């Protein structure tokens, strides 16, 4: 009796992965461009760790400053400056103070989840959630949930794309933002794209990225 050949199992595919970069990220000012609905948009984004520590919500914390500006057909429509407060080693976000087009808000995390030590293409998960308050008060005015997802580079190469998502409401208005970071060698090389809700419509911004995909 002739034996049938053994069936071969396909080799498992090795998914691309990179060490997670240390937080907060250090992103030099990046130019953003977009067009939507016949309008032309331009902007800048940066994320800069600050020196020293300060008090936040009753405890000593480190901080970083995130800046986002957007113009529509040459006219300013968004000026946002966030000061993010966090603990180091391990990184744990505490909250932030937010200035958005002149309005002042506070945000406190109710829960936070660190990025995994290794980012693998196809992976995703929670980053945290919290509550918005009127500045310097206990009056809650909204909430926010943050998640992440990892994808391969759209241009090939060894870099991967880490996208963080933030969705929620403030004063009854929905907010939505997605930021795509180029990750290589355990470092955030730059911002590839920003998606942000403007007047109820999500607008996709591409960045110059200044060669951050060249790996």
In which residue ranges do the predicted regions lie?
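Acidic, serine/threonine-rich low-complexity disordered tracts
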Residues: 2-76, 136-215
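Predominantly extracellular/secreted and cell-surface proteins with exposed
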Residues: 76-135
């Amino acid at each position: 009796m002739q034996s049938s050949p053994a069936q071969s199992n396909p080799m498992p595919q090795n998914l691309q992965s990179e060490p997670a970069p240390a937080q907060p990220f250090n992103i030099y000012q990046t130019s953003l461009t977009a067009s939507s609905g016949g309008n032309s948009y331009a902007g800048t984004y940066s994320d800069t760790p600050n020196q020293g520590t300060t008090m936040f919500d009753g405890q000593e914390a480190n901080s970083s400053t995130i800046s986002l500006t957007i113009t529509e057909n040459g006219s300013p429509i968004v000026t946002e400056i966030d000061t993010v407060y966090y603990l180091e080693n391990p990184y744990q976000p505490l909250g932030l103070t937010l200035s958005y087009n002149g309005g002042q808000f506070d945000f406190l995390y109710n829960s936070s989840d660190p990025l995994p030590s290794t980012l693998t293409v196809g992976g995703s998960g929670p980053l945290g959630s919290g509550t918005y308050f009127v500045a310097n008060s206990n009056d809650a005015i909204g909430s926010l949930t943050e998640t992440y997802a990892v994808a391969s580079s759209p241009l090939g190469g060894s870099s991967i794309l880490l996208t963080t998502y933030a969705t929620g409401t403030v004063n009854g208005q929905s907010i939505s933002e997605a930021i795509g970071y180029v990750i290589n060698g355990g470092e955030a090389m730059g911002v590839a794209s920003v998606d942000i809700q403007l007047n109820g419509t999500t607008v996709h911004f591409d960045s110059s990225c200044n060669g951050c995909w060249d790996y």
